[in-house]
Amino acid sequence: METATTLEIASCSQRQVEEAADPADAEGPQTTRQQEAGSPSLQLLPSIEEHPKIWLPRALRQTYIRKVGETVNLLIPFQGKPKPQTIWTHNGSALDNSRVSVRNGEHDSILFIREAQRTDSGCYQLCVQLGGLQATATINILVIEKPGPPQSIKLVDVWGANATLEWTPPQDTGNTALLGYTVQKADKKSGLWFTVLERYHRTSCIVSDLIVGNSYAFRVFAENQCGLSDTAPVTADLAHIQKAATVYKAKGFAQRDLSEAPKFTQPLADCTTVTGYDTQLFCCVRASPKPKIIWLKNKMDLQGNPKYRALSQLGICSLEIRKPSPFDGGIYTCKAINALGEASVDCRVDVKAPH
């Protein structure tokens, strides 16, 4: 359509020139040829075989984010034939050639920044012009870095095992929105930092479950897409978690009465022994308070007799008859006596001569 229109304009101009020429002029044909060769109105306009159009990559249709120091290398393909003219602008102004370089090819244009800085952020526009036609594409570039630290942090209150903190936002957010704050604690003894809250969006918080008897310091980092701030302010005061004074009131209770009159749980057993061989008699008694143990032979007290040795320990009573003779045979009695009563057990001992 564009080619046909251009040819029609050229034919019409040529007819107008021929009609205006005088046939009687001696130099008519020569002058006409000169006019045809030299008149600007007779020059044919270049034909547009392909309209200009920019094929913007999908990734660049939203804000293109890079970190400070990274390389920006954008290739933007376009169409247009013959080769169109390409013009780049940054925020409506020409590019700074000391920082940004552009390479234009037959079918694409490359925008290159070796080390991006925050000042390189903004709106970049590519304009492709061909004849009276043009196509434009806009690319938003955002160069970001780590945020600065919060300006201050203050320990507001300490109660029980809890501490209240407040801080102010950082002055520099790194050229992008903050994702939140990271709160950490460290006890005075170990000095190790542990994270309490991550990506916390408020500028005040309550730290709970602190250990009684410890003293804690706190610090806060700011965070954005690049990560945590390089430094963090630390509370000037320590949070001392005091042990609450507890008053114990003893409950009254009835003391159990364990008093008991003597009672033999294991009686004496009758035995037969041989003359000259030591013999022992055993029995068990239970009583509270501790009873007095008395040994009798044929109802005669044996206390103080060196031939016999009486022992009593943990309720076990024993009587040793040293080298018995036939005279030592008889009825032996063990008697237990305390304030609540008394009890006794008997056994018969026979002493035989050896065969």
Curated annotation (Swiss-Prot):
Stretches assigned to the Ig-like C2-type domain: 46-140, 262-346
PTM sites of type Omega-N-methylarginine: R322
Matches recorded under CDD domains: FN3
UniProt xrefs under InterPro entries: FN3_dom (IPR003961), FN3_sf (IPR036116), Ig-like_dom (IPR007110), Ig-like_dom_sf (IPR036179), Ig-like_fold (IPR013783), Ig_I-set (IPR013098), Ig_sub (IPR003599), Ig_sub2 (IPR003598)
Residue positions where Phosphoserine is found in the record: S39
Positions of region (Disordered): 1-43
Protein biosynthesis among keywords: no
GO cellular component, one term: sarcomere
Disulfide bonds: C283-C334
Entry keyword annotation includes Acetylation: no
Organism annotation: Rattus norvegicus
The protein's name in its UniProt record: Myosin-binding protein H-like
